[in-house]
């Protein structure tokens, strides 16, 4: 019974089904060994009985034949039969114990099967990993089948045999898991390679399709962009032309403190039409102007004045030549309008700053290069105000029909500080002199030329525009200034150039075939701004002082003469890229409303 209890304890120590199976297999092997041993003992007992029977038969023969006097050895046979019966009894008892053990094993196997889901098999494997590694070699040497041992051999202790077989089962199971994982890894690797190849093929096809689609899309987009830019330019140009390629503004200077004593201004704006001015005095001299494009009131600030003239600068951005010049007699406020003091800069600096702002708004599509040059026409000689060593420059005409001045210094500007410094440097070099009309009278025509080169990064087209900002010398009569000597010579040169400017305007008004641009340096320089599709704005300055009555009337006459000119477009030869657009939205442009002319 102790052996039976030990077998039950072995089954109870099993925690997993595979351990129960191993124990069951080993018990079966032990049963076989026990049966073999029992059969061997039975065979030996039978041999002993046979020997005893043979001896007994021999004794009986001897006794019958008279060779022996008595018959013996009965006790030996009974002893053999007793031993054989005892062995059979032992065999039956062994079978009973084995049956009980098998029944108990089935119960334990069922319990372990129910508990298997709650056990952490991986934890048990990890805790025994080192022990398996140490006993692997010895486990592998355990024979897979147990052959019957001779009766005299020593059988390995049962617990040690169970432990060896348990470890061998663990090792085989781990090997199978490792082989399965390796197989799955190889399959996943092949699947990954196949997926990668398929993905690369798909991406290549997608890339080709996207490249084709993108190329077509951008081609259509650029074509539409060019068409829209051309249409916008045409509309803007038509609007400017409707207002007149040459436009005329009047600006009436405010009265000075010395002019307000018991004196009414001789120049006033018509109460019914703000595009008409009246020039009159108490003696009956009177002049009423024809309708101008705009009359700037005396209370307008420098900022308000620039807001009125800024739309024409858009044409310069689009590649047209633009000229804004101030006309009037000495003391009427021309230089104040164009230059202005440091605290209230005039049109020159504000116009260049507007170009910077426009360039900044469109830096994504347009690359701009802005250069500034300053010159004066003094006694019909062109002097470079930024390089005083250039005192007598010549005018040349390019193959495209543009006027060019070789040797004129052009300074690239990139900030407001550079613009201010450049204009101040040129301003201090211009020619001035004291006359009876003004203590610091400009004795030359001062021209600030701004060159705007714009390259469209999308269309690769280039636009070149010129902005001429002209402060004309005083238009007063020689008799009023009482000039003599050098001042007289300067006044005669000034009046001659202004007269030739009037002749050019008259020829344009009459659509003459020959326009006398070459009669003076001023008209030659301004030829691009007066001819073809260029845009010109003339600000005629009038003084409310009674002493300047005749000069104001003369200025009004000049304004009426040039205000009736309508230039013919398309007479200039231009590069194909001249029409490329740099683009300004309609919301950013302010157009100057035209007033009806009388």
Curated annotation (Swiss-Prot):
Biased composition range(s): Polar residues: 136-150
Keyword Coiled coil: yes
Region named Disordered: 133-155, 569-598
Sites where the protein binds ATP: 328-335
UniProt keyword list: ATP-binding, Coiled coil, Cytoplasm, Cytoskeleton, Microtubule, Motor protein, Nucleotide-binding
Protein localization: Cytoplasm, Cytoskeleton
Chief location of this protein within or outside the cell: cytoplasm
Gene Ontology MF terms: ATP binding; microtubule binding; microtubule motor activity
Family note: Belongs to the TRAFAC class myosin-kinesin ATPase superfamily. Kinesin family.
Coiled coil location: 19-66, 89-118, 170-248
PANTHER family for the chain: KINESIN-LIKE PROTEIN KLP-3 (PTHR47972:SF28)
GO biological process: chromosome segregation; chromosome separation; microtubule-based movement; microtubule-based process
Matching Pfam families: Kinesin (PF00225)
InterPro entries registered for this protein in UniProt: Kinesin-like_fam, Kinesin_motor_CS, Kinesin_motor_dom, Kinesin_motor_dom_sf, P-loop_NTPase
Protein name (Swiss-Prot/TrEMBL): Kinesin-like protein klp-3
Domain Kinesin motor: 245-565
Species whose genome carries this gene: Caenorhabditis elegans
A GO CC term assigned to this protein in UniProt: cytoplasm
Membrane-spanning residues: none
Superkingdom of origin organism: Eukaryota
């Amino acid at each position: 019974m102790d052996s039976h209890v030990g077998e039950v304890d072995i089954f109870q120590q099993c925690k997993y089904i595979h351990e129960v199976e191993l124990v069951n297999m080993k018990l079966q092997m032990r049963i076989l060994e026990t049966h073999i041993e029992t059969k061997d003992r039975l065979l030996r007992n039978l041999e002993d009985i046979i020997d005893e029977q043979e001896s007994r038969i021999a004794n009986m023969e001897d006794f019958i034949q008279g060779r022996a006097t008595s018959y013996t050895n009965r006790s030996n046979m009974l002893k053999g039969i007793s031993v054989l019966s005892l062995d059979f009894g032992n065999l039956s008892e062994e079978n009973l114990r084995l049956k009980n053990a098998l029944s108990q094993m089935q119960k334990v196997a069922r319990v372990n099967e129910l508990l298997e889901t709650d056990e952490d098999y991986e934890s048990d494997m990890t805790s025994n990993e080192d022990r398996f590694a140490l006993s692997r070699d010895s486990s592998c040497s355990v024979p897979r089948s147990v052959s019957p041992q001779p009766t005299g051999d020593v059988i390995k202790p049962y617990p040690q045999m169970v432990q060896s077989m348990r470890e061998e089962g663990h090792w085989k199971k781990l090997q199978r898991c490792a082989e399965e994982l390796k197989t799955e890894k190889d399959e996943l690797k092949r699947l990954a390679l196949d997926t990668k190849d398929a993905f690369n093929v798909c991406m290549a096809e997608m890339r080709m399709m996207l490249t084709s689609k993108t190329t077509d899309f951008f081609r259509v987009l650029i074509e539409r962009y060019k068409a829209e830019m051309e249409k916008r330019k045409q509309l803007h140009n038509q609007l400017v032309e409707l207002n007149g390629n040459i436009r005329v503004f009047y600006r009436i200077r405010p009265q000075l403190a010395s002019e307000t004593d018991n004196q009414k201004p001789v120049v006033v704006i018509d109460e019914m039409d703000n595009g008409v001015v009246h020039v009159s005095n108490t003696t009956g001299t009177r002049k009423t102007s024809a309708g101008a494009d705009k009359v700037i009131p005396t209370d307008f600030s420098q900022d308000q004045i620039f807001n009125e003239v800024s739309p024409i600068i858009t044409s310069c951005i689009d590649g047209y030549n633009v000229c804004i010049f101030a006309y009037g007699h000495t003391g009427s406020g021309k230089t104040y309008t164009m230059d202005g003091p440091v605290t209230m800069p005039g049109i020159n600096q504000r116009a260049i700053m507007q170009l910077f702002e426009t360039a900044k708004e469109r830096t994504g599509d347009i690359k701009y290069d802005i250069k500034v040059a300053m010159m004066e026409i003094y006694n019909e000689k062109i002097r470079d105000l930024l390089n005083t060593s250039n005192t007598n420059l010549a005018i040349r005409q390019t193959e495209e029909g543009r006027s060019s001045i070789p040797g004129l210094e052009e300074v690239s500007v990139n900030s407001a500080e550079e613009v201010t410094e450049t204009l101040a440097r040129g301003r201090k070099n211009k020619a001035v002199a004291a006359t009876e009309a003004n203590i610091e009278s400009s004795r030359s025509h001062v021209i600030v030329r701004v060159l705007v080169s714009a390259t469209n990064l999308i269309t690769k087209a280039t636009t070149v525009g010129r902005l001429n900002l002209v402060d004309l010398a005083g238009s007063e009569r020689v008799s009023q200034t009482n000039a003599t000597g050098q001042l007289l010579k300067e006044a005669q040169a000034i009046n001659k150039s202004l007269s030739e400017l009037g002749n050019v305007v008259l020829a344009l008004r009459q659509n003459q075939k020959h326009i006398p641009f070459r009669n003076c340096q001023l008209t030659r320089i301004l030829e691009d701004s007066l001819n073809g599709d260029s845009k010109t704005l003339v600000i005629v300055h009038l003084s409310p002082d009674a002493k300047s009555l005749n000069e104001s009337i003369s200025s009004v006459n000049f304004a009426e003469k040039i205000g009736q000119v309508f230039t013919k477009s398309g007479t200039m030869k231009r590069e194909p890229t001249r029409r490329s657009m740099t683009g300004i939205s309609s919301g950013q442009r302010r157009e100057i409303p035209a007033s009806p002319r009388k």
